[in-house]
Each structure stands twice: as C-alpha cells, then as structure tokens.
Amino acid sequence: MHPVLCGLAANPALPAELIDRLIAVADTAVDSALALRPDLSHVQMVALASRADDTAVQLAYVGRLTAPDVDPVAQPRAALALLDKRSGRPEWARLFAMDPAVEHREKLAACPGLPPDVVETLAADPDVRVVAELALWTTADMAARLASHPHAEVRRALAANEATPPAVLAMLVTGEGLPPAERCLVCDREATPFVHDQECSLTDCDLPPGASCDGSHESTVHDMQLAALRNPATPAGAVVGFADHPSMLLREQLAARSDLPPEVAGRLVDDPDAGVRGELAENPSIGDAQIRALAADHGYDVRRRLAHNPRVPLDVLDQLAAEIRISSHPLPRIAAASPAEVEEMARSKNPALRMVLAERRDLPNGIRDALALDPDAKVVKSIARHPGLSEAQLRAMVDRHRVRVIAKVAANPDASAALLEDLAGHEPPGHKVFREIARHRNATAPSLLACLASRDARSLAAGHPALPPHVMVELLSHDDWQVAEAAASNPSLPPAVMSELVPGR
C-alpha cells in the first residue's frame, strides 16, 4: 500500500486528469479508494473494475456498474454482486447455478428475486452449504418445503430466516410434525460421538469450536434453537419453555424477545445468570414490576443495562444514575422524555441525572443555559457540546472547571477560532482536546500546528484544509503512514504538488 497515493485517491480536489493517471498505476488499496469517489466518469469506473475483482464488486454494490459493464465469466464476483442487487441478468443466474465453484453457487443462493427454475436447482444442490444458504434467504413457500430437509444445517438456516412461516418455525423448535434430521456438518465428517476441540490447530478445519454430535446433532440443534429465538417471526408460545433450559445462551435470547409473556419475564428476573438478567433489563417489553425488581439486582451490569431501557421510570433512572457509571451517549428514556419531565430532571438534586439529561442536544434554551452554569463539572462536560451556547458561556465553563471540560468545549460546533486557539494553548493541556480541535471546522492554522505535536491528533490535523500548504507538503514524508495519507487527502494541497506525486507525467 502506498499511503500518499491512497490519500490522493480520496482527495476531493484531485483534478480529473490526475484521476486517470492514478488509475493507470494504482494498486488494490488505491483502487478501493478511487472507487469511492463520486466524480468518476463511467469510463473511469469501467477501467477501475477491469483492474481488480474486489474493486468491481465494490462498484457493483454501490450501483456504479451495470450489467453491460460486466462479463460474468471474467468477473464472476462482480456479476454475482449485481444479481444480489437485482441488477443482473437471469441468464447469469442459470450460469452460476451450474458453476463448478461451490462458493459461486453459495453466493447465488443468497441473491433475491432469482428465477424459479434457478431456485429449484439450488434447492437440489449436492453441496449442503448451497442449500443452507438458500434456506437462509429464500421465500416462505420454499422455506416450508425445505423444513423437512434431512440435513440439520439446512434447518438451522431456516430458523434464522424471517420469511420462514411461523408454523414452520414452531415445528423446527419443537420437532413436532417433522422427520428427525439425519445428518449434520459434524457427523458428515467424523465418526460419532465426536466433540470438536475448542483449540483445534488444523488450518483446513472449518467446524466451529465445540461442535459436537452424538447422533442427535446436538450442537447444530442448539444453534437452530438459538436462531429461532432470535427470529421475531417465531411464535412466543413455541419458545417460552426455554426459560428453564440449561443453556444460558438460549435463556439470554429468550429474555431479549419483544413478545416475552409477563409470567416468563417474572421467572427470568430470578435467573442465576447475570447475562440473562441483563438481557431482560434492556427489554422494553418488560413491565414495571420487573423493572423495579431488576433495579435492586446485585449485578452492576444488570443495573447499567436497565438504565438503557426506554421504559424505565424516571424515579428508577434517578436511582440508577447515582449508582452506576452511565455512558456519555443519551439514554433512550432521556431522549423520549416529555417537556415536563425534562424540566423536572433539570431541577433534580442528583447531579448524575442532570448529567445524562445534559447529553441531549435539543434542550430548550433556558434549560441548556441553566445546565451550563451547573456547579458539577460532570454536568458541564455533558452540556458543553450543546449547539447554541455563546462564546461567553463556553469561556465561562473553562474558567470555572478548567482542564476537566476543555475537550468537550472544543467539541462544541459553535466554538470560535479564537477560543480553539486558546484551548490549544491551555495549561495544563486537556486529555483529547487536540483531537477535538483538529477535527473542528473552525480550527485555524495556529491551533492546528499545536495539534501536530499530539500523536493522537496529528493525522486529523494533517487532513484539515486550514493547515498551511507548506506544512502539508512536509507531512507527506512523515514516518507515520496515517499522517502522510491524511496530508495527501487534504483538499488544500496545491494541485502542482498533487501532479508531482502521481507517476506517469
């Protein structure tokens, strides 16, 4: 990979004639960067696609190649990508359905809208991987037909397909109405009973760690049950019995279901595994009784996840905010709070609750301004990025709380160039402040030059258009490839310098 050429390939100011020269000399990494450019001509896109299959696939998926641009024999992966986007030709599907390469048939099986005869061919494919891939993506009618397939891997894939009819999903879970599966990937390869080594060292082995079969295909059945529990189309009545299953993974997925009956949720509140209770805590379908019981849970992570439940009552959230460390992202319950609830939280005596409220970016001006004057630095850090704060308010925050808030102040979209320059020279320097300055639209040359001294911010500063051009040129030869690439991608890089960097003049 050539970082400077990769940077130039992504540079929005790169002249059209240099794009042509770059295409002629590009490697795979540069091709990928060029393929993302919105200003490529059709001729340039076709030229790029002809150089590397990966690039052709990339261009096909973003809709920049069409069927006339692709030869399915020379570029099979690009043709399959177009089929996956419903932009390929039906005859291609028939060609790939008979392709000796299993990976091509498997990819085809995942494509939507295939001709019926192609679907029938794939359903009868001799390789179970192809049939399983079809089962994962096929329509309800074919899913119902494949439910009695003798291979457990096909049934596992059907259990994950949301188009599989609910009645069929129930049969897959309970086994009622279906003949027993005859084979699985484990007993296809090994004499049973067999348990695959968790630390298998064979490089050509693709069995999952711990995969096992004693004749009942137990690990595949477990995976099928797990897929069915994750599938919202599976009827709740078919899976409630997993509340007492010995598998923690199955109970976790049951606890996360949006159609969980209240009586089952009540049983899972007392589950011995904290992971199960944590899934339940985040589930917006649980009732007030379960929420309040989980608020008293001894598991820290259970209470943390409960705080992210969009239906948690504010009095419970008040309690949780005082007990646990909550992420800086707005909580769903806070985001959904009514105007009256917002006012109530802004007056809370609990600074942790005021802090999570301050993470919102749509607060009324009066509440925003009141939180900007909060005596608690945690609250001020949260509100500092809120749009609409004046320069005087931002400077007052820094005067009161100093290094504890300067990175958040620097992240405010309305921070002025003068304020950013002052923050860049603040003593002591704040953690992360240089990264925030380097990515800020209002940053000027003096503050960006200060950012270059920070290893964490250097590459961001190198790509900022306000950096002096002579500094960009110096950074093109920097030891850190990310810095050199960022400098080359800078739209303020002089065109003459760009031309010198691209071979083929």
Regions flagged by a language model, labelled:
Residues 1-505:
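Alpha-helical scaffold segments
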